[in-house]
């Protein structure tokens, strides 16, 4: 009997400012197990806080492919025609027939995050002074419920799992005010990369509650470093 092993290409490793990062399917994943040596000339400058930022309740999710061919999908900031500040720009993307197309979830409920804590090694006699070493960060995991939804809607959402398996799926989040949360870099908005999207089969609520489907995915470590909130000219909940 012959056994054939498929060798996968190792992720590309880049080094900048003494810190390693992995390039996986065109996605940059920051690694906290950094060899930050030599040290920077001075400590970083932390911006002064002018006002708090809290996004609120996530009520809809906008899915989009991360890559548009060989370039990243992006929407220019601003309120000119086709720019991110106009609801019409997002509405047009719903009917696109290429990599720029967006798919919008129905209303979701019970949104919750967990994880995001440090991955550590050691403690006790294994490390100096018994202090654990931080070797990375666990992903932030997102979960929600789709209550009382027709299963033809769920069947279409399940197709997005294939996009996730290809590491080519991102999301924009929509809150109760119709604002959008995404990655803002320079003058453009980008979808937040996610992995491990799962859309579950129908669960019957029977006497005590509505029927529902579970949905979940994971953000990659460092996903929120350039996260920002976009206020449109009209509520994105209308998408």
Model-identified regions with their sequence ranges:
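N-terminal amphipathic/basic-hydrophobic helices that include classical n-h-c signal peptides
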Residues: 1-31
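Secretory pathway export signals and precursors
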Residues: 15, 32-33, 47, 158
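Generic recognition of cysteine residues
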Residues: 19, 36-37, 144, 162
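Polar/charged alpha-helical tracts
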Residues: 31, 88-95, 155, 159, ...
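Solvent-exposed edge beta-strands and adjacent loop segments
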Residues: 33-143, 192-210
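Generic structural motif
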Residues: 66, 147-151, 174-177, 210, ...
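Structured, beta-strand-rich domain cores
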Residues: 115-188
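Mixed-charge, glycine-accented linear interaction segment located at domain edges/termini
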Residues: 188-239
